[in-house]
Structures are given as C-alpha cells and as structure tokens.
Amino acid sequence: PKIRSQIIDAIDALAVLGRDLITTGPSLSGTWRMLWTTEKEQLYIIKNANWFGTQVGDVLQVIDVENLKLDNVITFPPSGVFFVRSSIEIASDQRVNFRFTSAVLRGKDWEIPLPPFGQGWFESVYLDDDIRVAKD
C-alpha cells in the first residue's frame, strides 16, 4: 500500500507538471507495454492467469490515433491472448475516450469470442518516445 501510494503521488505530480502538454497527437500512436496499473479488470486477469495453466506475458496497449483504434492485449505464453479492440475519440489535449467493439480469449487450438461491453477514458499525463504515463 505504501509503494502504491507513492506511485500514485508521483503520477499526480507528473500530471500537474504536464498539464499544458498535448499528449493525444500522433506520438501517442504505438505499442505501449504496461509496467504498472490500478485497473481492476486487468489486475483480475493477471492474478487469475493460472486458471489457464499459464502466467501473464506482456500486457500491451496498441494505440492508432489516425485510425481511432485502441487494442488492449494480454498475452499468456506460449500461445494464449486476451484481446480487446476499442474505438477511440480524442476528447481533449490529454484525454482519450474509448468504447469496446470486440473481445476474444484465444488459446493454441481454441477461441472464445466475448461480448464487448464497456467504455471509459484515460489521460496521458506524460509522453515521450519511450514512456507513457496514463491515469483514468
């Protein structure tokens, strides 16, 4: 809990320092690896990967600003993936709204389509060529 609080405080400090930055332009497009999150849904999936006899591999967000698409990808080595596609809307200089459009859980020889329900938003409070810090 103490480390979590320190990380959130650091993110909030970055948000204040970067409040005038534009982080929703073309430089937001790319494949971003998640290193830390407070997202309950992602944490639940990560925690319960052992249900499938595996552990979590990469957790990625693939953002395409030009085509207004967002893909959330959680890999389960050696051949599994949970994939959620979303449409996005640039709402402000730092805020992106998204709406889920499709979801699938895929293994080596099987695939389960899931209903894509939900929507949300995130604000990229810091962005450079290597690091993106977002909050929601």
List each model region and its residues.
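Soluble ligand-binding/transfer domains with enclosed cavities or grooves
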Residues: 1-136
